[in-house]
Amino acid sequence: MYVENSYLSKQLCFLFYVSSKEIIKKYTNYLKEYDLTYTGYIVLMAIENDEKLNIKKLGERVFLDSGTLTPLLKKLEKKDYVVRTREEKDERNLQISLTEQGKAIKSPLAEISVKVFNEFNISEREASDIINNLRNFVSKNFDYSDKK
């Protein structure tokens, strides 16, 4: 177990990096069954069952730009998890929605978070505190809707 009093162990960015990498590794083990990457997983989980979401709004939800989302959405469409349709009023706007298969896997995908949580040596209270602190950190410091 890594607990060290070194320069890196005191760096917020490094601790985020290690945590993110290791958590994603755990998710990846479960996502193989669905032929999904972690990024594909968060995109599917960000789309509500009966929602049509434009690519810009989806990107804001998951902090990804259209250059990253477009190839990912094409892969998800080939797997029959999402469908991409052009908006009638403005064909430049692409609408993303879940297919029946995409809706069907949302429940088992949501259970992955519970499975991953159970692999950690952490209480529900500690997890809740971390989530609240990180949500606060993200909301105070990052706004993906900002123009770059």
From Swiss-Prot:
Q: Which effect does the record note for changing residue 67 to E?
A: Reduced DNA binding activity, hemolysin production and virulence in silkworm-infection model
List UniProt keywords, sorted A-Z.
Answer: Activator, Cytoplasm, DNA-binding, Transcription, Transcription regulation, Virulence
Domain HTH marR-type: where?
9-139
Name where it's found: Cytoplasm
Induction trigger: Transcriptionally activated by CvfA.
A single GO molecular function term of this UniProt record = DNA binding
DNA-binding region spans which residues? Answer: 55-78
For this protein, the record's InterPro entries field holds:
HTH_MarR-typ, Transc_reg_Sar_Rot_HTH, WH-like_DNA-bd_sf, WH_DNA-bd_sf
Keyword rRNA processing applies:
no
Q: Name one GO biological process term.
A: response to stress
Q: Which Pfam families match?
A: Staph_reg_Sar_Rot
What Gene3D superfamilies does this protein's entry cite? Winged helix-like DNA-binding domain superfamily/Winged helix DNA-binding domain (1.10.10.10)
A cellular component term, taken from the record's GO annotations: cytoplasm
Q: For this UniProt entry, what is the primary localization, expressed as one broad class?
A: cytoplasm
What task does this protein carry out?
Activates transcription of virulence factors alpha- and beta hemolysin genes (hla and hlb). Also, activates RNAIII expression, a central regulator transcribed from the agr locus.
Family indicated by similarity = Belongs to the SarZ family.
Q: What is this protein called?
A: HTH-type transcriptional regulator SarZ
Q: Which gene encodes it?
A: sarZ
